[in-house]
Swiss-Prot record:
Keywords, ordered alphabetically: Cytoplasm, Methyltransferase, rRNA processing, S-adenosyl-L-methionine, Transferase
Pfam families cross-referenced by the UniProt entry: MTS, MTS_N
Gene Ontology MF terms: 16S rRNA (guanine(1207)-N(2))-methyltransferase activity; nucleic acid binding
Localization terms from the record: Cytoplasm
Protein name: Ribosomal RNA small subunit methyltransferase C
Disulfide bonds: none
GO cellular component entries: cytoplasm
Tagged with keyword Transferase: yes
Subunit structure: Monomer.
EC number: 2.1.1.172
Taxonomic classification: Bacteria, Pseudomonadati, Pseudomonadota, Gammaproteobacteria, Alteromonadales
Organism of derivation: Shewanella amazonensis (strain ATCC BAA-1098 / SB2B)
PANTHER family: RIBOSOMAL RNA SMALL SUBUNIT METHYLTRANSFERASE C
Family label: Belongs to the methyltransferase superfamily. RsmC family.
Reaction it catalyzes: guanosine(1207) in 16S rRNA + S-adenosyl-L-methionine = N(2)-methylguanosine(1207) in 16S rRNA + S-adenosyl-L-homocysteine + H(+)
């Protein structure tokens, strides 16, 4: 199966025939494998861990990595960029593309009409010729541009916004990579969670760590924690690492699909889970998170999250933990706190 933006690429396969091709911000489909039948080589960079896991392994002529950058300084004839949902991330992806293109190489940009791709020319930068629209189908657009200037390798730290936050435990510095949501102030949900954290010790998991606000607060309030921070977004993981470093703290930061890549039991799991839209698919993921959390807590371990009050957590929490314990709430959020019996 192919996503609509990928279908648009295959409609223009002559652009890629017998070329060395790199895909940046790849989606969870089979385009990479499909292109091996037409291209001399295909490499793919996934910024979403779920998209990385969806790629076929062991396919001849296809390599895929997860992260914020490709691990090798390779050059390609064509780079295909999937226009990101977070438009602020686009210039960074185009800078990556410029670095990995040979002189006069071709950049293809594919994405949904509603995703902001029409503003591509304003975001391309000076390394490329003006973008030319070459196809329009399946509610998506495909643009092409040519590398016209020598590019330097993007330094990730040049794409960070740094700002200070005041927490109940003290002031901290946050390092936020482009494309990672932040309004440069403590959001109401996280603030409510941090105001109601118990004293913690031992091995603790920050699920959906984002830029590391909760992680740093946990370390401030509980020195000596064995803290682990997980997310599916490569830019969020880098943000968390940089934020911890900026505050003189250390934690294990890694990608995980839900809790699947975590190992062993935790004394506590704390989260502002990234499940906010109330869609059935999102609710299913949230339900699984509650059940998986229970399995990975020590007996007596703490489980504490903040969630939009309209999301249907209560029934699942009651079923899994045996009761629902709401320790704080306002007109938008609830903080749930339970122990494993």
């Amino acid at each position: 199966m192919l996503s609509n933006p990928s279908e648009l690429v295959t409609r223009n396969i002559e652009q890629l025939e017998n070329q060395r091709v790199m895909l940046i911000n790849i989606e969870a489909d089979e385009l990479g494998h499909h292109l091996t039948r037409h291209c001399s080589e295909v490499a793919a960079l996934a910024l979403d861990f779920n998209h990385f896991q969806a790629q076929p392994s062991g396919k001849s002529g296809f390599r895929c990595e997860f992260g914020h950058q490709w691990s090798r300084d390779e050059k390609f004839d064509v780079v295909v960029v999937y226009f990101p949902k977070a438009k602020a991330l686009a210039p960074y992806l185009f800078a990556l593309a410029a670095w990995h293109l040979r002189p006069d190489g071709t950049l293809l940009i594919t994405g949904e009409n509603k995703g902001g791709i029409r503003s591509v020319d304003k975001l391309l930068g000076n390394a490329f010729s003006p973008a030319c629209k070459i196809d329009n189908a399946r509610h998506c657009l495909l643009y092409s541009a040519t590398l016209v200037a020598e590019a330097t390798k993007p330094n990730a730290e040049d794409w960070v916004s740094r700002y200070r936050l005041s927490l109940p435990s003290g002031d901290i510095q946050i390092c936020n990579m482009v494309g990672v949501f932040s309004d440069k102030q403590l959001d109401q949900g996280t603030a409510l969670l941090l105001d109601n954290l118990p004293k913690l010790e031992g091995r603790v998991l920050d699920f959906g760590c984002g830029a590391g606000v909760i992680a740093i607060a946990l370390m401030q309030q509980n020195p000596g924690l064995q803290l682990e921070c997980v997310d599916i977004n490569a830019m969020a993981l880098l943000s968390c690492e940089l934020s911890l470093k900026a505050n003189g703290m250390e934690a294990k930061v890694y990608a995980s699909d839900g809790l699947a890549q975590t190992d062993g039991l935790f004394n506590a799991i704390v989260s502002n889970p990234p499940f906010h839209d109330g869609l059935s698919s999102t609710t299913d993921i949230a339900t699984r998170f509650v059940a998986d959390s229970y399995k990975q807590l020590h007996k007596g371990g703490n489980w504490q999250i903040v969630a939009n009050r309209h999301l249907p957590y209560s029934d699942t929490i009651a079923k899994v933990f045996g009761e629902v314990n709401t320790v704080a709430e306002n007109n938008k959020y609830k903080v749930y706190a339970n122990k494993k019996r």
